[in-house]
Each structure stands twice: as C-alpha cells, then as structure tokens.
UniProtKB/Swiss-Prot annotation:
HAMAP family: Phe_tRNA_synth_beta2 (MF_00284). It catalyses: tRNA(Phe) + L-phenylalanine + ATP = L-phenylalanyl-tRNA(Phe) + AMP + diphosphate + H(+). Its cofactor is Mg(2+). Its EC number is 6.1.1.20. Tetramer of two alpha and two beta subunits. Keywords: Aminoacyl-tRNA synthetase, ATP-binding, Cytoplasm, Ligase, Magnesium, Metal-binding, Nucleotide-binding, Protein biosynthesis. The gene is pheT. It comes from Methanocorpusculum labreanum (strain ATCC 43576 / DSM 4855 / Z). This is Phenylalanine--tRNA ligase beta subunit. Belongs to the phenylalanyl-tRNA synthetase beta subunit family. Type 2 subfamily. CDD domains: PheRS_beta_core. GO terms for molecular function: ATP binding; magnesium ion binding; phenylalanine-tRNA ligase activity; RNA binding. The keyword Metal-binding applies. It holds the Pfam family tRNA_synthFbeta.
Length: 540
C-alpha cells in the first residue's frame, strides 16, 4: 500500500480544521498514520481508495466525515474545443486514451508536490507500474491542439523531461532513468506510443516520459491531462480522480473530444440501497433518514425513497463502489466503528489453526529452506495468463467472474504456476537468479482446494535442478511418488514429467516451453513444478 505524504499546512488549509483533528480522524476513516512530523504527515491508505492518495482527496473526504461539508461534490465540465485523434496502429500497443483540460490553475510548491505524489501513487495502484495506466500532465500554453496520439517510429527524436538534448525514443529507453525503469512495457513493439500537438511537437512518450517542452511549473495556469493505457476502465478512473483533485485546487475542468467521444465524464453513478439490509449487515440500527445523513458524510448524494430504500449518487472518483455492501461499509465508517457496541458470543469455543493453514505453513518452511522466496499472487486472473500463454487448453471447470471490472481478472485461478510466470515476467528486469514459490487455494467446479507451485529462472536452469528441488520437497513432505511421461505443453517434451501418488496424478514439473517464455517476455530458461495438495491435508 502506498504511503501518501501530506503537507500539514496545505492539508489544514484544504480541510478547514487543525492538524490534530485531522490526525485523530484519519484512522477512523480506514487509514493508518505512519509518521507525524512538524511539516508533514505520512498516511497509508488501502489500495481500494486511490481517490485518497493526495492532500486534495484526503481533505475532501475529511470535510465530509467531520461534517464541515457534506453531500455530493458537483463538477461542471465545459467543452474546451480541443480534440485528440488516436492512431488505429496503437490497437495492439496501447490503445486507450483519456484526457481533460484544466483551466485557471494557480499552483504553489505544495500543490505541485501533491500532484506528483498522486500521479505516482495512481501509477502504482491503478496503473500496475504504468503498464495498465500512465499519466501525463502538460503546460497547455506551450502547445497547440488538435493533438494526435500516434504509433511513432522508434527513431523519432525529442527532448525528454529533465534533459536538454534531443534523443531518439530507443535512446530514451536505453539511457534515460525513466526509460530504463519502464522499457519493458513497450520495448517489444515495432512502433512506440507518442503524443504530438498540431505542429508535430512531442508532448509525451507514454508510458515512459513527458517532453521537456511541456514541463509544469508554478507559473503554469492551464494544463492538458493525458492518461493512456491498456484497460479502458482503469484509464477512466485515473482521469476522474485527477480531475476531482484539480477541482479541489480551485481549477476548472473542460472536456476534450477523442475521436468524437467526450472525456471526462464526471457524472455520478446512481444506485438504490436497502436500509434494513445495511442495518443487518453492519449491526447498526438506523432509519432511512439516518442512513442518508451517514452517506452524505461520506460525500455521497443520498435521498430517502421510502422507509427501506435510499437513492444514492456515487461520486465519479469512487471506483471502489461495486456493490451495495460497499455503500453499507461507508455508512458504518461514517457512524464510527468505535461507537459500535461489542457483545460476547453466546457460546465459548477454543480456536486452533485450520488444517489447510498448517499445511501451508509446512510448505512455506520447506520452500524457504530450499532458498525460494514466497510470492503472493492474486486469486483472480485471466484465461490468457492461465491457459493461452501457458499453451494449455482452457479448463471447463474454471469459475468465471460474471461482471469483471478488468480484463486481467476474469476467472478465479485454477492453477498457481501461471501466476508465478506472470510474476517472473513483471520482474524480468531484476537480477538473476529468481526462485519463487506460492501456495494457496484454487477453485474448480465450485470446489476450493490447496495447491503449490515453484519456479526458478536463470541462465543455467535445467531439468536436473527442478527435479532435485521437487524431490527434496516431496521427501520433506513424506510424499512417496513416481514420475511418468507428461503431455503438458507448458513444458519442453522430453524434459517434463507428471508426478503420481498411488496411481493418481498430483503434479507436473520440468523445463518451461520456450514458446511460453516468449509469451511472458522472458529471455532466460525457467524451470518449475506444481503440486495438488488435497491429499496431504491432516484431519487432526
């Protein structure tokens, strides 16, 4: 979770109260104050609330929670007359673009620092290290529309931010600090994303670096915002959060036409919720009018429909509200968790570790002893990662998400190994060797069961290495196994094997297929094994 550094003077100015009140209120809103200094407060927010990753967003929420300013923030968006065109050649590179014009910005150093912090936090929380989303902020008065988002030749030159000489895009990836850090996102493509103005001047090379031409300073008054990415919802979320933050700075928002589509859309989402369900779920007795007051403290628009129904307007920046229960959680936060009365359970019981957790602890101890580092991948993944990239047939027993919010999270994982391969891909710029493992639940046909997997990548990884690691793991788990020929196309024929116990297949191991390595963007040989742990859960 990101640590948000809040300037005390700026935060109190935005909130309208003193820093002591702010610091005492933040934990009750679901955050954790990490450090308190004379001029700065460091706060850790949960990843589901990226709208709080700035002094502006935090102040907006605090004003509601403290009753200083409640209800739905409203955002007037005027047309700017500025347009963007998107090159169809970007379809398989970085196809999505969001934008807005920010007028009448009067920025001091605290505002610039807050904006830069929000930008980087969104790159982490929403953008997955700029792969899914990257943000560009430009001084609009230095450039002219209409603007073009194009797939440019790799030899295109411009002066990158913090430099005073022109460089080709290839040179930027090889030499510029930001280029070296994020080259992995675009280096595989024949052409690179580029944003230019009406005169062909370069504004940005997303997701790598802006041009020095459009640097934002304290003298900047009008801003062009660009957000590019590979997932349209994530792009839209980032644009909305940034626009809402600029409004807190006193700026005005104007829309941009992107191939005829207007951006941003800052209208609230409407939803109706049940008062009785909220009371039952939270344990807080309340009426419809009381629930309305609580939700308005959390900056929702709320109106009583009848004694059990409340109409809710969800602010555009609240990307975390995906279910009625998310609204009920906010009502409980506004009520105050410290005010909820505790009660003893009606019966006395003694807790003990769950057998599956005991098994996982044993697996962790063994793998750490074998010099592997634990990885904790997400439970939700995609069919592309689990099957297509692994050269495996789609599993008909996979449980699909009905309304996925991201193309990366469409199924509940049925295997652990594909997620380890994805982790190796994300960390391919790190030093070798990398030896990682993970253990956790997978789901097939609505049945949840435990699995583990391990993977190793380095210049000399081979079948003998992973066979030895798998054998050591099985011996320490007291697993008596036999190896048979495998037909798993995720591994190289002749350098793979299935693991059998009592005539039943429980796993697979071997050298990863070169085609799989290419799919994940890996340049070195990798080896891996995966084992179904269902048969080793103790009944004690």
């Amino acid at each position: 979770m990101p640590i948000v550094k809040l300037n005390n003077e700026y935060l109190t100015r935005l909130t309208g109260t003193d820093i002591e009140t702010i610091r005492s209120s933040l934990p009750m809103m679901g955050s954790e104050v990490e450090r308190e200094e004379e001029k700065q407060t460091d706060v850790q927010f949960f990843p589901n609330r990226p709208d709080l990753y700035s002094a502006e967003g935090t102040a907006r929420a605090l004003r509601g929670y403290l009753g200083i300013e409640t209800g739905l923030p409203t955002y007037e968006v005027k047309p700017s007359g500025i347009s963007f065109s998107v090159d169809p050649k970007l379809a398989n590179i970085r196809p999505y673009l969001g934008s807005a014009v920010i007028r009448n910005v009067h920025m001091d150093n605290a505002m610039i620092e807050s904006l830069m912090g929000l930008q980087e936090s969104l790159h982490w929380a929403v953008g997955r290290g700029r792969k899914k989303v990257a943000i560009g902020v430009h001084d609009l008065d230095k450039i002219e529309g209409p603007f073009s988002y194009i797939a440019a030749d790799r030899k295109t030159t411009f002066v990158p931010l913090d430099y005073d000489v022109e460089m080709t895009m290839e040179e930027i990836l090889a030499e510029h600090p930001k280029g070296k850090a994020y080259a992995r996102i675009v280096e595989e493509f024949e052409r690179f994303p580029l944003i230019t103005d009406a005169k062909g001047r370069v504004c940005s090379f997303p997701p790598i670096i802006n041009g020095e031409l459009t640097r934002v300073t304290e003298d900047t008054q009008n801003i062009l915002l660009d957000v590019t990415g590979i997932e349209p919802r994530a792009v839209s979320v980032a644009v909305k959060i940034l626009c809402a933050a600029f409004v807190e700075m006193g700026a005005e928002i104007e829309s941009v036409e992107i191939d005829g589509v207007v951006s941003p859309d800052l209208r609230p989402e409407k939803r109706t919720v049940s008062v009785s369900e909220c009371s039952k779920l939270t344990g807080i007795p309340m009426t419809a009018s009381q629930m309305t007051e609580l939700l308005m403290k959390m900056r929702f628009g709320a109106e009583v429909i009848d004694e059990d129904t409340v109409s809710v307007d969800i602010p555009c920046y609240r990307a975390d509200i995906m279910h009625d229960h998310d609204v009920y959680e906010d009502a409980a936060i506004a009520y105050g968790y410290d005010k909820i009365e505790t009660s003893l359970p009606p019966s006395f019981t003694v807790g003990k570790p769950h057998p599956v957790q005991k098994l996982y602890s044993l697996v962790r101890n063994i793998m750490v002893g074998l010099s592997y580092i634990e990885n904790t991948p997400f439970t939700l993944t995609s069919g592309d990662v689990s099957y297509s990239l692994m050269h495996r047939p789609e599993n008909p027993a996979a449980l699909h998400v009905l309304h996925p919010i991201s193309e990366d999270q469409t199924i509940i994982r049925t295997d652990i190994l594909p997620l380890l391969m994805e982790s190796l891909s994300i960390n391919r710029s790190r030093e070798l060797p990398q030896k990682i493992f993970a253990c956790g639940d997978v789901v097939e046909n609505l049945v949840t069961y435990p699995k583990m997997a391990a993977a190793s990548i380095h210049t000399s990884a081979d079948f003998s290495e992973i066979y030895a690691v798998m054998d050591a793991f099985c011996r320490m788990m007291s697993i008596e196994y036999e190896v048979r020929d495998s037909a798993d196309d995720a591994f190289i024929p002749g350098r793979r094997g299935d693991i059998y116990v009592s005539g039943e297949k429980i796993g697979v191991f071997g050298e990863i297929n070169p085609d799989v390595l290419v799919g994940f963007g890996l340049e070195h040989q990798a080896v891996a094994f995966e084992i179904d742990l269902r048969g080793f859960v103790s009944n004690e």
